[in-house]
């Protein structure tokens, strides 16, 4: 059985409470309007994202897709919500189409195009036409359309200073280049004026040359130069899976290195590999969150940005949902986990004031600012013992080992305080604790101070674990 699927709840004794499953009881309430509920879930993210800078990268495949106008509508919504946007687009299929029309050779080495003079002409043509197509969609304002009444200024320019890639491993890449720097001052000025910045996959040198660039590298360099809050890649594939075939939703830098080093079956697509490499570098360069989202899924961009569980892969430089000490500001979230059980009589009712006094005993796991699990540690140092209480997990998050993580975290805290034994009181979850090394004991084995508070009517079972 999964560690977070606790079948019932531990009882509270005296002034302290113990293990509960916050989904153990469902209390009747007035039906919730689904539209109102959606707005309530959506609103905190609106406030969190307003005024932030997001760099969004997508390939030329997205632009060529008949569904691209829908993605543009979603991007326009982000702008309307006060998010500062930089769009970086690719143009590979558009370039290849023009090369084919001209009968020119298409040559790639290590995923990079060899850009000779004929290829550069196709790059310029395709990049310019693709940029104009995106600008036209962002300018759409027809009545009875999602863009009705919307006016979005679009800024393009020579924001990217580039250099030639040169000769690598004996291969002359011609007019293929690399980003030298981003004119972040000019770019910031356009964003400050309320414009959406649109950057094609080309760069310019101080000598007036034009270079063909990889869109992922342009996006990465732009995000780093601006100190963006998010770097978002809209990729072609359906995402990543672990060895058991489960979707991967979060990656750390080390995880990405392992993925890139492994020989995937089937092999990883070029755009996904490029996005992972760029995301890894951006993460290590201070970008707090990098997102990989399948652009083919309708609404995936909005779901990733405005729901707690998202719709893609999140890259961060530190683990998500790390247990931490609760703060006073976490009290409302802890109450939301415990109140249903208190109302149902599973736990002893506690006031907000009392929880505020005891909050220093609590450890929590949060997700996007929402407390999704909690536990408390009440030491009895004179007896070398401590009680673990209030181990509760949000009903939507019981399949991720969060109960085990909190238990291990609390055990570690107890050891650090010189505690040798940890005890719990329960009526219905004894097997869960037995599986994790707790042994049955009698109330007489409890610290004297706890024995004085023991409720014999509830007749909770006592379980003790030697640390």
Q: Which residue ranges define each predicted feature?
A:
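Conserved acetyl-CoA-binding loop-helix of GNAT-fold acetyltransferases
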Residues: 399-412
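A short, internal acetyl-CoA/4′-phosphopantetheine-binding micro-motif in the GNAT/acyltransferase core
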Residues: 391-399, 428
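Ligand-binding beta-strand-loop-alpha-helix segment within the catalytic cores
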Residues: 100-198
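A conserved beta-strand-loop-helix scaffold within acyl/acetyltransferase catalytic domains
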Residues: 349-393
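Conserved GNAT acetyl-CoA-binding A-motif
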Residues: 412-427
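Short amphipathic alpha-helix that is part of the acyltransferase structural core
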Residues: 318-348, 459-462, 466
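C-terminal "cap" of GNAT-fold acetyltransferases
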Residues: 445-467
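Polyanion-binding loop/helix "lid" in catalytic or ligand-binding cores
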Residues: 68, 116-146, 184-185, 191, ...
